[in-house]
Curated annotation (Swiss-Prot):
One of its GO terms (biological process) is translation. Pfam families: Ribosomal_L25p (PF01386), Ribosomal_TL5_C (PF14693). Part of the 50S ribosomal subunit; part of the 5S rRNA/L5/L18/L25 subcomplex. Contacts the 5S rRNA. Binds to the 5S rRNA independently of L5 and L18. This is Large ribosomal subunit protein bL25. Belongs to the bacterial ribosomal protein bL25 family. CTC subfamily. One of its GO terms (molecular function) is structural constituent of ribosome. GO terms for cellular component: cytosolic large ribosomal subunit. InterPro entries: Rbsml_bL25/Gln-tRNA_synth_N (IPR020056), Ribosomal_bL25/Gln-tRNA_synth (IPR011035), Ribosomal_bL25_b-dom (IPR020057), Ribosomal_bL25_C (IPR037121), Ribosomal_bL25_long (IPR001021), Ribosomal_L25_dom (IPR029751), Ribosomal_uL5_bac-type (IPR020930). This is one of the proteins that binds to the 5S RNA in the ribosome where it forms part of the central protuberance. The gene is rplY.
């Protein structure tokens, strides 16, 4: 996963009024926290954050902070992003300080590869788990996890435990949890027989 720059400004004032003021000036409030540092309130440009987390890896991009005094040069990932439910615009961001030598837990998107055999037979794809939690070094975070569904037949599922092991990546979660299934098509009811 590539590293990106994110400009931040330290802020001493907090609260709803300050947050509204920041949003009117196309900025958002945020907080940086993590091992070895106290939580620090920051502000950053909305568009810059959107650009930094755009693309395939989304929130899992490693971001290097600039302009934040003691935070300058710190590496973070987006731990939480509060967005406007109607407009989708960021309202607040939590940035988690990381160390490239320490493993972290993140959620990555599931990317389906191929067309399931059961779908070709008329079944319906039930995509139950769009993201999977993994644990790895920050430099090993994949943009997504590929799940090959070509051999998936009617009435069968692919579970977390069925995933191929990837070097340096531990897949977390219940091994029996279903990621994707092919559901059988509904049986057509027989037409009622007309009485003579």
């Amino acid at each position: 996963m590539d590293q990106r720059i994110l400009n931040v400004e330290l802020r001493s004032k907090t609260g709803k009024g300050i947050s509204r003021q920041l949003r009117r000036s196309e900025s958002i409030p945020g907080v940086v926290y993590g091992k070895g540092i106290e939580s620090v309130s920051v502000s950053l440009k909305t568009k810059e954050l959107s650009n930094a987390i755009a693309g395939e890896g989304g929130r899992n991009h490693i971001l290097t902070l600039k302009g934040g005094g003691s935070l300058d040069g710190q590496m973070v990932i987006v731990a939480d992003l509060l967005q406007d439910s109607l407009k989708g615009l960021p309202l607040h961001v939590d940035l988690h300080k990381i160390n490239l030598a320490d493993k972290i837990k993140v959620k990555v998107k599931v990317n389906l590869v191929g067309t399931a055999a059961g779908v070709k037979e008329g079944g319906l794809l039930d995509f139950a788990m769009h993201e999977i939690e993994i644990e790895c070094l920050p430099s090993h975070i994949p943009e997504h996890l590929d799940v090959d569904v070509t051999s998936l037949t009617l009435g069968h599922s692919i579970h977390i435990g069925d995933l191929k092991e990837l070097p340096g990546i531990k897949v977390l979660g219940d091994p029996k949890a279903s990621i994707i299934s092919v559901l059988g098509r509904a049986k057509e009811e027989a037409a009622p027989v007309a009485e003579a």
